[in-house]
Amino acid sequence: MSDLTKTIKLRIHVTPEQEVLFRQMTEQYRQACNFVSQYIFDNQFDLTYQSLNKKLYSSLRGLFGLKSQLAQSSIKTTIARYKTVKQQLFQNPYRYKDENGNWQRITKTLEWLWKPVFFSRPQADLVRNRDYSFVDSGQVLSINTLGKRTKC
């Protein structure tokens, strides 16, 4: 059975207190993704989820105050971004003319990167029934933030 992923975007109306909670959560998530990205860059571009989770999970929880699912999602988000960059580099090889005038190509790998992938916008990848859920017959959205669960 294949996995099916659906992405939704919604606009929710929140109180000023909830807005602060969401901004804190998305900013901490962004910083956690940058932390994971720096680790991947410094450690030979290891993109295996299990090894990254083993090495970074407790640091993500402690340094950024992320709940368990958000810590794991930050690792998955960063791995996905590096895999996208890897594919883009592969599709655009380095081309040059050799001494005979023939075009040669060298496949680019992640080692061609000069700096780690950087996450500039606050974001959060939420997992249904873990980070968020619909309650009250689907009329209310309950979202996990850094400190507490809030309903909108």
What are these regions (language model features)?
Residues 1-152:
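Nucleic-acid substrate recognition interfaces
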